[in-house]
Every structure is written in C-alpha cells, then in structure tokens.
Swiss-Prot record:
The gene is gloB. Zn(2+) 1 binds at H54, H56, H113, D137. It comes from Microcystis aeruginosa (strain NIES-843 / IAM M-2473). Keywords: Hydrolase, Metal-binding, Zinc. GO terms for biological process: methylglyoxal catabolic process to D-lactate via S-lactoyl-glutathione. The keyword Metal-binding applies. Its cofactor is Zn(2+). Binds 2 Zn(2+) ions per subunit. Pathway: Secondary metabolite metabolism; methylglyoxal degradation; (R)-lactate from methylglyoxal: step 2/2. The lineage of its organism: Bacteria, Bacillati, Cyanobacteriota, Cyanophyceae, Oscillatoriophycideae. This is Hydroxyacylglutathione hydrolase. Its EC number is 3.1.2.6.
C-alpha cells in the first residue's frame, strides 16, 4: 500500500492510498475533488473507498463528486455521524476493522473535536515497519483539534488511545499546522530540549515549503503538549496535577493563541 499527500484548500491534506498491483485506490478525508481526480488519472487506478474521519466540510467536501464519478465506491465513517457524511454507507465504531488492498485497519472512536470522530490505524506488516494512523483533526502534529462538540475528558480519553500506539507510527493528520502548534508548545513547555530542536527543524522545513506530515508518534510523545498532560513540567505550568484539567487549560490557552 502506497500513501501520498494531496494538497487541498489552504492547509488541508487529502491522503491517497493505492495499490499499484491491483490498480485500486482509497482516499482519506477528501476536501476537494480535483486533486483526487488528477492523481487517480495519472496513476490509472480505480477509486474504491472513501475513509472519512468526521463530518466537517473540509473533510467530506469532495464525497459527492467522487461518488458521481466512481458510483461503485464505498464510503466509510463513524456510526455517530449518520446523516452528516455525504454518501456514507458503512457506520463504524470502536473495534471495527476495515480492509483495503489486503491491509486491515483498526477503527478507534475518538470523540472530542466532534462527537462522532473516528481514526483508522493500519498496523505494520513486518517487524521494523511503521504503522499508519489517519487521525483527522483529533491529533495534530504538535497539537490537537479544537473541541467543537466534545469535552476535555473525552479528548483526553481519545488521545490516550492514540498515545498508546507504538512510537514507530506515522501520524497522517489532515492539516499543515505544525509550525504554529510548536510555537504555542514552546510557550507552555519552554525548557523541553526535544521540543526546541524539533521547532528549529520544522521552521527550516516550512521555510523551504516542505511538508511536515506525516509526523512520527514517538516524536509527538516527547514534544506535543496535548500528549503530555501528565508531565510534571506541564502540571506545574498549568497549576494542576489533574490530567483533564491540565489538558483543558492547555486547550483554552491554545484557543486564544
């Protein structure tokens, strides 16, 4: 299974999964149809699935156009998103598994950003390989999504699930927010040497207009404050030893950053 990033809107990524041997493809969170159409035609592959993480327009905006051109494809989304994702046919919940090109993805229910958000995780095939996590707007590189429909407690529970995955997991989040997220992270975790180093690297990448996605989960665990709600440094900064309260205060600060 090959994975490509497709740029969309101002800072979105659509992820194209494809198998050159079987000539089939799937897309994760298609915001716009044209980038997908162009790449499918260039690769000469058939679109068989849309994997949606949640219902927001910048994640499902291309669903209907893709269905119109590829009417046989299957649209996957969360069970709680029934009626909110265009063309949805399969309604997934925690513990479900979905197949693409001989690979099976595990489904995680990760409410917080929305009440129905899900994530897809393809475990590694061989020892030493990376797992692939498609997490929409739940976990960002250096950050996490705003809480539009969920609570801090729900988001901490959701991020705990994702944090428990192996360090050697590639994080395919749906927006290029890394540099701004790390700028914020430095305001709440200024003495974190790993974070300081990562910020310098990301700043250089973005100056050269290079993408920072996928991120690596092991790096996120060391540098992303929204995966470090239980670290002593952040507990001190947020003046709380209660993880959900630490997270809520972090999120409140980020919302106003």
């Amino acid at each position: 299974m090959e994975i490509e990033r497709l740029n969309a809107l101002s800072d979105n990524y659509i992820f194209l999964l494809y198998d050159p041997a079987q000539k089939i493809a799937a897309v994760v969170d298609p915001a716009e149809p044209e980038p997908v159409f162009r790449r499918l035609e260039a690769l000469q592959v058939d679109l068989v699935a849309i994997f949606n993480t949640h219902h927001h327009g910048d994640h499902v905006g291309a669903n209907q156009a893709l269905i119109n051109r590829y009417p046989h494809l299957c649209v996957y989304g969360g069970k709680e998103d029934r009626g909110r994702i265009p063309g949805q046919q399969l309604f997934l919940e925690e513990g479900d598994r979905v197949e693409f090109a001989g690979r099976w993805a595990e489904v995680f229910f990760v409410p917080g950003h929305t009440r129905a958000h899900i994530a897809y995780y393809f475990p590694p095939v061989n020892p030493g390989d990376y797992g692939e996590l498609f997490c929409g707007d739940t976990l960002f590189s250096g950050g996490c999504g705003r809480l539009f429909e969920g609570t801090p407690g729900q988001m901490v529970a959701s991020l705990t699930k994702l944090r428990s995955l192996p360090d050697q997991t590639r994080v395919w989040c749906a927006h290029e927010y890394t540099l701004n997220n790390l700028k914020f992270a430095l305001t709440v975790d200024p003495n974190n040497a790993a974070l300081q180093q990562r910020y310098r690297e990301v700043e250089k990448h973005r100056a050269e207009d290079l993408p920072t996605i996928p991120a690596i989960l092991g790096t996120e665990k060391l540098t992303n404050p929204f995966l470090r709600w239980d670290s002593p440094a952040l507990a001190m900064t947020m003046d709380s030893s209660e993880p959900v309260q630490v997270f809520a205060r972090l999120r409140g600060k980020k919302d106003n950053f």
